[in-house]
Amino acid sequence: MNILFAVSECVPFVKSGGLADVAGALPKELKKLGVEVRIILPNYSLIPQKLRDGCTLHKVINVPLGWRNQYCGILKGEQDGITYYLIDNEYYFKRDSLYGHYDDGERFSYFSKAVLECIPHLDFEVDVLHSHDWHTAMVNFLLREKYQDNPLYEHIKTVYTIHNLQFQGVFPPEVMYDLLELGDEYFHSEQLEFYGNVNFMKGGIIASDQITAVSPTYKEEIQYEFFGEKLDGLLRKYNDKLSGIVNGIDTSVYNPETDSYITAQYDADSLYEKNENKRALQRYFGLPEKEDTPIISMVTRLTKQKGLDLVRTVFREIMEEDVQCIILGSGDSEYEQFFEWMAYEYPEKVKVYIGFNEELAHQVYAGSDLFLMPSLFEPCGLGQLIALAYGTIPIVRETGGLNDTVQSYDEETGEGNGFSFTNFNAHDMLHTVRRAIEFYHDKPVWEQLVKQAMTEDYSWEKSALAYKKLYKSLME
């Protein structure tokens, strides 16, 4: 079974969000199950030179884009036993950031066409083409509408994964007419038209044989108006080919037993070593070294989606508790400034690192006691899974993947791996934080809770089995 992942980013080459983690980890897990996965992505100038040096020029072709042919170099390389193809075109991919350019519609129209034009030249017979998010949604649409009549493509099945419905790739109609060479018959509400523009993600949903969302709860949520980003009606229409498969984490990267970034490695049976990480974290940030004061952390993009309005509303009330708080992340200036002000106001209790630091993030996961993630919506979420693996108990809102992966602690049965609240309400969150702090001070209960969190399986294995089953169903 041969699968081609068409993605706009992938670890270890280049990363702006969770899509890159999925594209980097899932193929390795599928390979263990006997599924051959290769990955095709743009050859961005941002890719580290040593990774590009590991690739060789496989072939040069031309890609028809509207009235002109564009150069396309196909580079080929291997990392961790996975074959990668990089689509080389400096005009489109020599930029200082992955996305957010005036010509993104043209850039990813080119990339979508390049993926399809490359397939006959890859020395790899593709059974299933698996596209991800808006950037490669049109690969599946163009395959169905423009390429499937060709014997080289007619057998290929398609899967499309929605990682975040909020970002849809909406562009002026000229992109469809001039670059993708699609006529008027595609510019109406049953096809690509979307409030007077063209919507790439809509194309992926319509044309793919199967659609997945990155958690079962998110799959349900996006069919309702509140979460549906104006595509809820379309998703209800195609509900029969929509499923939810929760993401995992790469346990070769996030594993407290082997993590070289943390001060002391540990497992569920050596939690005293976790306290060593806590002391190291307190020293790093200049916090008082108090072993019995819980550290609540957030490693997050500082955006509205992450529920930071709730945190802002009751932050001073949280500070009335005997806690320390560490925030690591960057994003909207209003949230950056708020947390910097809180660090100034509570110098003995609050520390903030604006930006991202991979090594420090690992130390925060290892050294904290509680991990706060009160998202407005969360397709899957990576932070809570990493926190659980490190025995740092998550406090989450019951939405998307948070609802699927965090089971609220039940003092009657002793079951659970975290704490959760239902409504997007600051005082519901505050109550849940206080409840978590209360149990933190009940050491036998807390130790049991941490062990339960750490001994669950957060790897990609279960997810990979679900994807393998999905691919297999398409080929029967």
UniProtKB/Swiss-Prot annotation:
Pathway given in the UniProt record: Glycan biosynthesis; glycogen biosynthesis
Record flagged with keyword Flavoprotein: no
GO molecular function: alpha-1,4-glucan glucosyltransferase (ADP-glucose donor) activity; alpha-1,4-glucan glucosyltransferase (UDP-glucose donor) activity
Listed GO biological process terms: glycogen biosynthetic process
Amino-acid positions noted as binding ADP-alpha-D-glucose in the UniProt annotation, renumbered to this chain: K15
Residues that span the membrane, as ranges: none
Lineage top rank: taxon: Bacteria
Transferase in keyword set: yes
Keywords: Glycogen biosynthesis, Glycosyltransferase, Transferase
SUPFAM superfamilies xrefs: UDP-Glycosyltransferase/glycogen phosphorylase
Reactions performed catalytically: [(1->4)-alpha-D-glucosyl](n) + ADP-alpha-D-glucose = [(1->4)-alpha-D-glucosyl](n+1) + ADP + H(+)
Stretch forming the signal peptide: none
InterPro entries: Glyco_trans_1, GS/SS, Starch_synth_cat_dom
EC numbers for this chain: 2.4.1.21
NCBIfam families with a match to the protein in the record: glgA (TIGR02095), PRK00654.1-1 (NF001898), PRK00654.1-2 (NF001899)
Record function comment: Synthesizes alpha-1,4-glucan chains using ADP-glucose.
Family classification: Belongs to the glycosyltransferase 1 family. Bacterial/plant glycogen synthase subfamily.
Listed name of the protein: Glycogen synthase
Organism the protein comes from: Bacillus cereus (strain Q1)
Classification of source organism: Bacteria, Bacillati, Bacillota, Bacilli, Bacillales
